[in-house]
From Swiss-Prot:
InterPro entries: AA-permease/SLC12A_dom (IPR004841), SLC12_C (IPR018491), SLC12A_fam (IPR004842)
Highest taxon of the lineage: Eukaryota
UniProt GO MF annotations: potassium:chloride symporter activity
UniProt-annotated glycosylation sites, renumbered to this chain: N218, N228, N243
Organism phylogeny: Eukaryota, Metazoa, Chordata, Craniata, Vertebrata
Name the record gives this protein: Solute carrier family 12 member 9
Main location class: membrane
Source species: Rattus norvegicus (Rat)
Family: Belongs to the SLC12A transporter family.
Chain positions covered by the region annotation Disordered: 645-678, 843-864
Entries under Gene3D superfamilies matching the protein: Amino acid/polyamine transporter I
Transmembrane feature ranges: 37-57, 73-93, 120-140, 168-188, 194-214, 263-283, 298-318, 339-359, 377-399, 417-437, 467-487, 741-761
Amino acid sequence: MASENSPLLAYRLLGEEGAAFPPNGAGGSGVASARKLSTFLGVVVPTVLSMFSIVVFLRIGFVVGHAGLLQALAMLLVAYVILALTVLSVCAIATNGAVRGGGAYFMISRTLGPEVGGSIGLMFYLANVCGCAVSLLGLVESILDVFGADVTGSSGIKVLPQGYGWNLLYGSLLLGLVGGVCALGAGLYARASFLTFLLVSGSLASVLVSFVAVGPRNITLAPRPGTNGSSVPPRHGHFTGFNGSTLKDNLGAGYAEDYTTGAMMTFASVFAVLFNGCTGIMAGANMSGELKDPSRAIPLGTIIAVAYTFFIYILLFFLSSFTCDRALLQGDYGFFRDISLWPPLVLIGIYATALSASMSSLIGASRILHALAQDDLFGVILAPAKVVSGGGNPWGAVLYSWGLVQLVLLAGKLNTLAAVVTVFYLVAYAAVDLSCLSLEWASAPNFRPTFSLFSWHTCLLGVASCLLMMFLISPGAAGGSLLLMGLLSALLTARGGPSSWGYVSQALLFHQVRKYLLRLDVRKEHVKFWRPQLLLLVGNPRGALPLLRLANQLKKGGLYVLGHVTLGDLDSLPSDPVQPQYGAWLSLVDLAQVKAFVDLTLSPSVRQGAQHLLRISGLGGMKPNTLVLGFYDDAPPQDHFLTDPAFSEPAEGTREGGSPALSTLFPPPRAPGSPRALSPQDYVATVADALKMNKNVVLARACGALPPERLSRGSGSSAQLHHVDVWPLNLLRPRGGPGYVDVCGLFLLQMATILSMVPAWHSARLRIFLCLGPREAPGAAEGRLRALLSQLRIRAEVQEVVWGEGAEAGEPEEEEGDFVNGGRGDEEAEALACSANALVRAQQGRGTGGGPGGPEGRDGEEGPTTALTFLYLPRPPADPARYPRYLALLETLSRDLGPTLLIHGVTPVTCTDL
């Protein structure tokens, strides 16, 4: 664990070569010595080659011929704006900290979490695998177009046999060459890429020179079959040289049929082809594990590559529009060979771009796979991809990826996969934009990238534009990719992943919660919108598990805080003993499946600790208004962890993932007769303190006897029928009259109604008991109570019970806070409590047809039993010396009643107005 003595930056000052570098942590792709690629070789070259691909040689005429120069420029501008928005996000994330192996996957997973990062990382990996196969098959087709034995026309060199098997053989041989280069390390790949870059640059240079040096000429176009299979006369295209009329004719759009597919072209279809060839901006980021300084190389190299390719595309668009008529542009997409000073150099460029694209895809895929394997998100299935050479090259991931590409090559034609590959790339780009957007919106102080040319507007536009392009290119593939991402995320969520990466969702939640808490003004509170906000004080959760779940049901969308007081004095301790306990309490909340916060404190006494928690728990307008305590009696505590499946498994004491079981983190329950941390005097004083602070109080007794189905999270419709009994009258002051409608009585009704709204208690019948004196006529008081319940929208049965004649005799009522100190003696108070207890017990087993009756009247119809009883809690006496007697009276009152809640409310909680 980090302390103030830990170094702020874990940097090794001197490496083997005397240079400073950070250690390569988890998720890296090798030892530090593997980081040797410069910005140019590691980022610029692979990104340029990936963004050019084969489009730069074979699709310039296609785009300009169908869309015209103006629309082609608009398409290019829109495409590069979309890419540039993602590049800005990449630059921001890459300059905000150390970037290890995995490129885009590393950025996404360390921001959005392992679930989203792992799912998109796997999709990005599969996109690179399929992209490698598509490039190789495109290269095979380009070679066979010139050297194939079945080539039509006289220009071909018919030396290579053709067919499915031969095509697979050629693709496999080329894959072996590409895989060998990647398996031997990033250094050889960089040199091979640089050689390819030189070949492509030389080929493009020859094309640019040819536009100027070659004179006008007629070019015979490939013949097209007639409508009925008849031959048509050969057509000709014209290379006019620089000509104003040619440019004028090429300015507007002229969409026609694609001679290779016969499909009618539209703006969307042409734009999709152009954009498909430009989606290579992550080629450099995928090499992050081999870069000397990825935080500098990735943004700088990517921006240079994007600017360079944009300039070349613009130049080629203008030159083609100035010099080639529309017939040539639409009838021969490979017209560069026809106008070149040396046509074989164009072929070399075509082959070099296809080969470099396949190499870039394969090595990028291997680095993503290695990072996924290092993070252990998919278990043993990716274990072989962890293997690295002595120099840090992940040859295991290369071999793994090579095998998958070989399987994809078996499918032969992959034109249908091209759109899926592009959509998967766009999903990854959108995720990078979303990662940067999340970091920006979270406003975390540690998000301070050195690259500042971005904002949340650019990130949001990047996400929206990538999603739009996905559905423009292929709606089916876009919908399928989002569905696949959701399924993979659900799988990783169920499996569980690393939690030490940090979740930007937590930062976003903090930002939003803080904003809305500041808007939650306690001065605007109204009784119409009152809700319970509970503070449950727990000594040992082993004995309080049923109460913990019952309180969760009582909160009804309100605040629920689990409070615990650790006894001690910080002055006499070397460190705070409370902080290490938070993890165990949070695990308790998770396993008990309750929606609660945890608040712990250190105090010399439980009473003082309770005062601390009552004052400081919560935040802003979300502060506890009700204190919940277990009842103070002599019942031996039970260990509910032993009987609850969520806490008793696994028996070995370890949970899945190797963390200790919760049963090992809390001490065993107190043994019978052992000293308690809280005295009876302090217990009652804590209740009195809460009432002085204007907090409602709930004392819970015998909650361990609650029916298990009533504490479940499901519906209680199929459970055994039970009653919930409410006695909204102070049974220790049983005078008739309107006592049942005081604030405390209404609070009892409100809490019982809240409980009945919980699904597990829907089937329980709410009964409200109305006590009558022996000389009171039944019916009148019941009518008033029913009218009140109707106004409060409370559905309940009302039952009248007759209180014994001696209970009402005697002096007028004392003040509520001094009921023990009045004329009534201890013996009389004890007798009154016993009589009230007998009355309540007599009604617990009665059905709805019992009618009025006293303790002796048990001749009514037997019905459902009482699952929970709500009793009026009298206010503690003013004299602390009377506290033990007060507690004894409460014990007598609630003895043998089963699960009971004694409640005292001090705040209005009901409203009859709209």
